[in-house]
Amino acid sequence: MASLNSSNEIKSYQFKQMAFNKTTGGKKAKKIGVFCKPKAPSATDILGRLIPWLRKQNYHVFLDEGTAAIINETSSHEKKEIFQQADLLIALGGDGTLLSVARVAHPHNIPILAVNLGSLGFLAEISIDELYPTLENILAGKFEIENRMLLNACIWRNGEKVEDHNVLNDVVINKGAVARVINLQVLVNGQYMTSYRADGLIIATPTGSTAYSLSAGGPIIHPSMHTLVLSPICPFTLTNRSILIPDQSVIQVKLAAEYDDVRVTLDGQEGYDMRAGDILEIKKTKTSLQLIRGPNKNYYQVLRNKLHWGTQNDEDIL
């Protein structure tokens, strides 16, 4: 289990206990779980080439039901079984595909290779053209892991925990389309911080700082930083700005009054009702996500490419 102080470190990674080398004779083949966005461009062609290629390398491939259906495979596995068995996960799609896999896979400490099939892809930074050279390096044990922080979010209602989930990007509290400004009381480590009157509040990891939080005026945070960011959405008080707090903090957000429609959204994919008096408690998980880095890429290169920042010729750079 990763320590609380090492959740974002970049490190070289070798499959030690897994001995992720080709097997021969009667030895058991190593196991790779593959997940693909069903409506991704060219998903059928990509899987139709990838799966036979992996099997030819003598690796056992696990497909979930949705992925198997894309290429009409009759054999599929439950996601729980894949996470328990696999030595490596491949997520084909975009950031959304990775987020859905990561929330469940991270306690199992399985490295994930995220491949971008056409979307923005801050996290899924590996292109389809880079897939096979990257896989060859991975299967030879030559790659780097970037550990990404996750958050645990619980909703407490009348002293009882009614929801308990993990997120990679962010936890968002927001009002419905016709609801008025909501009042959110925020405590950090049991100490009262402030009350927000706003359309909502975003609590994001460094990974999530380039998602919804960025649109709300929050800062971009390097993944190695041990911090969380709280960003109010359209606050009534203009001095209510984004604030960074240590990642070992425990954040409690209380919905101070009754509103018609207030939701807690996790990574933009799952939503739950929040009622008057409910307390949303957020803290860092003990385990982190093991994300395989793209070849010859760094964080600033990804920012330049995805945010269309200005570039210079190599000879002009100091």
Where are these regions (language model features)?
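Short glycine/serine/threonine-rich phosphate/pyrophosphate-binding segments
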Residues: 43-44, 96-101, 210-214
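ATP/nucleoside-binding phosphotransfer catalytic cores, i.e., glycine-rich phosphate-binding loops
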Residues: 173, 189-192, 238-318
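Gly/Ser/Thr-rich active-site loops/lids in small-molecule metabolic enzymes
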Residues: 194-198, 202-239
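Short, well-ordered beta-strand core segments
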Residues: 89, 112, 201-202
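Catalytic core of DAGKc-family lipid kinases
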Residues: 120-199
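ATP/NTP phosphate-donor binding region
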Residues: 2-4, 8-88, 129-144, 155-165, ...
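Gly/Ser-rich helix-loop-strand patches that form or flank binding pockets
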Residues: 100, 105-115, 122
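Redox-cofactor binding/interface segments in oxidoreductases and associated redox assembly factors
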Residues: 34, 91, 203
